[in-house]
Amino acid sequence: MRNRIHRKHREQCCLGVIEVKGNMSPIGLTTNVLIAHAEEFHGNTEIVGVNVKGERRRTSWGEVGARSRRLSSALVKMGLRQRDRVGTIAPNTCDHLELLYAISGFGGIAHTINPRLFPDEVVYIINHAGDKALFVDPAYVGILIGHRHLFETVENIYITGPKQNEVAARMNGFKFLVDLFETGDPAYEWPDLDEDDAAVVCYTSGTTGDPKGVLYSHKSIVVHASVVSLPDSFCLSATDTVMPVVPMFHVNAWGVPYASAMVGCRLVLPGPNLDGHSLIELMNRERVTMALAIPTIWEEVLEILRDAGASLESVKRILSGGTAVPSWMIKEFDQSHGVRLIHGWGMTETSPLGSVNSPLRKHLALDGDEKLEQMSSAGRPHWAMRLKIVDEEGTQLPNDGVSEGSLYVKGPTVVESYMSHEAPATDEDGWFDTGDVGTIDGDGFLTLTDRSKDLIKSGGEWISSILLEEIIRQHPLIHDAAVIGVNHKKWTERPIIIAQAVEDESPTETEVLSFFKDKVAKWQIPDAVVMVDELPLGSTGKPIKRVLREQYIDYLLEGNT
């Protein structure tokens, strides 16, 4: 066989320099490549979506792919261009799935917005992202009414789903997705895109209180999709029926919409009604084999199953993330329902999966408490993620399962910088400080023990203690205050206020908590107020939260509500 060498390479060879590069096709790793693959090779595989009324829409990867292309062309005809941001406020539905692919498919950036945020926060992130258009599910239209005049860049707002209340909608300046879809070209073909361009932006709570945008590139999304599909991750295949309970506005539903298109599994999208009864009925009727949700959801599901003497008829495994999973939950799913609970760790800045608890060969022989202990850790990193723990001086600590330090991560699915922030999010070597504290053992298994950043995770949602402190310190009767997260039976963690009153004042708990009204979302308001004579202060004059957490960690569990 004759060897063929590119002229450039021949010339370099003559100079004694050989440049060796791959000769593979330069097709980018982009999201429209994923949906094109699903449309062509998994076209008959069913997708089931539930709307706000509980009605089920049955479609397929073939139809979703075709509709996404047509909708993408409609967005371009509307005047949107590559790198324009397009906001979505919606639960997991077929419309939302099509929008996710349509927006990034032409080169736009899908901005999935959390409808649980306080309206002022929604306005802030829409303006910060510079969204040109918004798509909102009927379940969340109320969020936008009365705030549209505050949107600085939004030109059009569309309601998804079938037309309803058309007169009222148009009076508020809303249009309909179904009308926009009709303007699209069914013959539209996906363009070639740069895999390093942004495809999706999600916002995360920061310690300053203002949410920060994390831009996921096409390549990072495809890499993450391949990671979560692996046997030692979510173990997804074309034989599965997967239900992401975690919404798309939580880091792309943990990557499931992309991984599902990659492997061709059947997909069930549960819509906005995420109560335990609805989820159990949906999982059993649609024969779901894999589902993903936060521990609060799974605790409610277990309670209902326990009271009814029922079980999950087809589910083989579930993934739980967002907060730590108690060992009793792992045990009950396993022993009472034959369901394997997979515990994972991640964050918005890591796309989100950072580690997943998949056993090594030596763990297969474990049973009883030893098995539960192993399954309760945050797991080991996937191939695209590096972990390390460091001490206060930044020195890396050994992976011995004992040495405790701050957790840093690095990899192609880790944020490098936040949207519109000049400063990098990582150190000079590319390591990102997660704000978590923990240990790593010799096999790479991560155990989280604390959190160093001022964030509280309640029912899977982040609450900034800094934001709450900024508000309460403006109260005329409060001299100083600290907000900490404490244990909660249902929500895992809830904020409480430890406050010092102005001299000669004795504000009541009601007076303090009512100060948050119309300033933050109701679920962000602290559960209790503890008045103290004096707060423990550090050398900089700030309250020492570590001391307060140690003292009040079980305050709500002791009946102080």
Model features per residue range: what roles?
Residues 2-4, 34-35, 77-78, 105-181, ...:
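Structural core segment of the AMP-binding/adenylate-forming
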Residues 47-93, 97-101, 118-123, 177-179:
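Conserved AMP-binding/adenylate-forming core of the ANL superfamily
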Residues 75-80, 185-196, 201-243, 255, ...:
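Conserved adenylate-forming
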Residues 96, 117, 123, 134-136, ...:
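AMP-binding/adenylate-forming catalytic core of the ANL superfamily
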Residues 222-241, 251-289, 304-305:
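Conserved AMP-binding/adenylation subdomain of ANL enzymes
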Residues 288-293, 302-373, 386, 393, ...:
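Gly/Ser/Thr-rich phosphate-binding loop
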Residues 338, 370-375, 395, 400, ...:
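Conserved ANL (AMP-binding/adenylate-forming) active-site segment centered on the GW(Y/F)…HTG consensus within
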Residues 381-408, 442-443, 505-509, 544:
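Conserved beta-loop-beta connector loops within the AMP-binding
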